[in-house]
Amino acid sequence: MAHRPRWTLSQVTELFEKPLLDLLFEAQQVHRQHFDPRQVQVSTLLSIKTGACPEDCKYCPQSSRYKTGLEAERLMEVEQVLESARKAKAAGSTRFCMGAAWKNPRERDMPYLEQMVQGVKAMGLEACMTLGTLSESQAQRLANAGLDYYNHNLDTSPEFYGNIITTRTYQERLDTLEKVREAGIKVCSGGIVGLGETVKDRAGLLLQLANLPTPPESVPINMLVKVKGTPLADNDDVDAFDFIRTIAVARIMMPTSYVRLSAGREQMNEQTQAMCFMAGANSIFYGCKLLTTPNPEEDKDLQLFRKLGLNPQQTAVLAGDNEQQQRLEQALMTPDTDEYYNAAAL
């Protein structure tokens, strides 16, 4: 296997400093070398345990330390989760992501988490979880249950991280990613733009991700969703071009990874989202809720896909089939009919 050269901070900084149109052109070239530019991977995210998190992440409404009006909920019943997964598949998602607001799962929760993974896989969906810190044994148990992806974001650069979170170290996050990788689970890891970080911090985040022993298969890039009651509620808005630039640099640095538009799409107009796809984004969360923050309504996503000529990617999985995704793609490509406008209800 050929040695993969490591990125340097100066190289990443040079990318961020490129004229935007030159950067977009390079990112689109890289994207087309590794992906079908018309295909977008579609995921649905469900909060399986909401609120009362002991962590102090300053951006997060689920922290018990902030008064955001969010009601805490217990871990959902397995069948409730699987019913949501069925609806996600019916709406065209190929990956179902389950997130829990805690620092780490307890051993008594593991059998239920394993059942959720097994049930999602039995439907023919890819299964993803984000549960906080994992032990080696927990990572292996989830792998044995069939978990495809584990999400654990680095959030920002190591240098800026302490300004945002103090209850979990940066190294703890890196250690969890290593345990997940060693268990044979694909890694999903990214960060947030708009925390108050500098461009150098954005470069530092992408440097950490790209220089992992194996870069993440999926890289979610979030735009801060400012929630009243959190310490970052009054942060400055993120300039759309700065966000697009971050997407483009991520694409160039991690050419074979899926780059996902995650939180914050509700704040983006269609033109900004279109430029993100041009910059190399090829994955979205699809649905009305992104954990506890708004996400564009499904039908708006389908209409945007139609305008841009994008198709939801079909994903081969060990269990189930892609009949639903084929029906959704057919609906997307049939404009001006009831089938198209009701594609989300298929």
From Swiss-Prot:
[4Fe-4S] cluster binds at residues 53, 57, 60. Catalyzes the conversion of dethiobiotin (DTB) to biotin by the insertion of a sulfur atom into dethiobiotin via a radical-based mechanism. InterPro entries: Aldolase_TIM, BATS_dom, Biotin_synth/BioAB, Biotin_synthase, Elp3/MiaA/NifB-like_rSAM, rSAM. This is Biotin synthase. One of its GO terms (molecular function) is biotin synthase activity. Its EC number is 2.8.1.6. One of its GO terms (biological process) is biotin biosynthetic process. The gene is bioB. Disulfide bonds: none annotated. Binds 1 [4Fe-4S] cluster. The cluster is coordinated with 3 cysteines and an exchangeable S-adenosyl-L-methionine. Binds 1 [2Fe-2S] cluster. The cluster is coordinated with 3 cysteines and 1 arginine. It catalyses: (4R,5S)-dethiobiotin + (sulfur carrier)-SH + 2 reduced [2Fe-2S]-[ferredoxin] + 2 S-adenosyl-L-methionine = (sulfur carrier)-H + biotin + 2 5'-deoxyadenosine + 2 L-methionine + 2 oxidized [2Fe-2S]-[ferredoxin]. Residues 38-256 form the Radical SAM core domain.
